Amino acid sequence: GTIQYQELQVYDGMVYLSNSVTDEEIRTIMNTMDEMGKMDRYMEMEMMKEPIAASADGKTEDVYLCVPEDKDMVDEFMTFRDRTSGEIYHLTDDGVILTEKMAKTLDVSRGDPIYIGVDGEEKEVTVTDICENYMEHYVYMTAELYEELYGEEPGYNSILFDLKNASDKEISD
C-alpha cells in the first residue's frame, strides 16, 4: 500500500458526497475548509461507487470509473505512470488510462479499444495509456470525453483534497 498512497494517489483525503448535495453546498463546504486555513487545494471527481463493466474481446471485468473535473489539475493528486519505465502519462480527451492489472486481465494494450458501460450504455473508448496501480481496478477519463460519450456532464460525487502542511499524524487523526 505504500507505493499506492505515497507515489500514485498522492492526495491527503477524499470526501464522498451524497447524491443530493448541490454545487452550492459543495462550494460552502470547501470555502469553510479554506477559511479555516486547512485547505491547500481541491478538485471534484466523479468516482463510481459501484464498479461498471469493462470489456474487450469477449472478456468482461468490473472496474471503477474515475472522471476528474480538471484533466490538468489531476496530476497534482494522482500520478499515472508506467510501472517499469517510470514514464509519466497525462489524461487526454483521446481515450482512457487503464490500470495495469485490468489491462492484463482484458488482454489489451495501448491503442486498443475497450467497451465501458455506464447506466446501461456501452461505449467504445481507446486505451491511451496503462498505469501502475496496486489497489482495485480503475479506468480514468476526462470530463470532456465523458460528456462526448454520454451527452451529459459527469455527476461529481467526491472531492480530492490536500491539506496545508499536513503531517502523517494529522492525516491519520
Language model segments and positions:
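Short, charged/polar "capping" segments at the starts of alpha-helices
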Residues: S20-R27, S167-S172
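Small-residue transmembrane helix packing/gating motifs
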Residues: E7-Q9, H90, I130-S172
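Short, strongly hydrophobic transmembrane alpha-helices
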Residues: G1-T2
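Short beta-strand boundary microenvironments
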Residues: Y5-G13, T22-P113, E122-T126, I130, ...
